Amino acid sequence: MPAGAIVYDPAYRDHDTGDHIESKSRVDAIMERMREDERARRVQILKPFKAAPDQVGTNHDVQYIASVRRLAEAGGGWLDLDTYCSSRSYEVSLLAVGGVICAVDAVMADVHNVMAIVRPPGHHAVWNKAMGFCIFNNVACAAKYAILSKDIERVLIVDWDVHHGNGTQASFYDDSRVLYVSTHQRPFYPGTGDFEEVGSGEGEGFTVNLPLPPGVNNDGFFYVYDRLFIPIAQQFEPQLTFVSAGQDIHYADPIGGMLATSNAFRGLTERVKSVTPQGQVIACLEGGYDLHALADSTLAICGSLFDFPTQAEEDDVNSGISKHVSDRVERAIKVQSKYWEL
């Protein structure tokens, strides 16, 4: 079997956010955990390249891109209430987009699955502004690169971050080439991602949202995927799959309110792999703010992507599916059965 790879560069630490919760210590914790694990240490590291501004421009307004560059060159400042831009953040944001594009090149060649450990995260960034710690939308830019440069016709984007990926959804809302599926806590930031948000025009039916209450455990997430997301993805038959991997659904996360353990991330990744068996799965770091939980959960994702064992996390909250979850799944099925056999 071809080898998998991790995309990482120490320069991702140079997006300097000070004592902000989205800080360089996130990638430090992940990479330290990777070095501690004998099998993870063997996975090849791909060095990313900076995306060209016109590659970012496939998904973002050129004036917005230029405004980020100017702010960084002026020494930095706040792009919005949540998102800080340091003097190096423009260059690092290009490197984050380039890292996921690098992953596309790799899986379209001879690499079997990729984990992109990049920052800043991306799934909230929209056409003309930063949002929610995100400057450029890494996954959306890379998906457009795959479509425009690699003749890919069907891209699946799975987003399990505790927050809805409003930016990614908006990028492909009228595009039937991209199937976007998301679980997210609701009510919660950014307030988008309702059941009835299904796409428009040619993209109608290619956006699948399942807003969930707080407190969903591993079994609840597995049920969502087994009952809704995987049957739809199997019918879509993706040629390339991205995961917006936000590990803030872990029970220890200080922002989210979910009850997943690190075991959930391995199980969810296994399910995603099942619909892209040719090895063209790219997991891209989004959220996750408890450093220990983030590191263990990302290692669990890598264990699934690269087929090595990881230690199961003991817990006592992950048996059973609540009626709150099953009721919401049935509501989503009622909406989506107009477009898919469910």
Label each residue range with its predicted role.
Residues M1-T58:
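N-terminal low-complexity, Ser/Thr- and acidic-residue-enriched intrinsically disordered segments
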Residues K24, K50, T58, V62, ...:
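Low-complexity, intrinsically disordered regions enriched in charged/polar residues
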Residues F49-E73:
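Charged, often glycine-rich, active-site loop that binds/positions anionic groups
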Residues E38-R41, Q63, K150:
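Short glycine-centered helix-capping/turn motifs at secondary-structure transition points
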Residues A11, R35, D61, D105, ...:
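Residue-level marker of positions within ordered structural domains that often coincide
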Residues P2-V7, A66-L342:
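A general "terminal functional-core" signal
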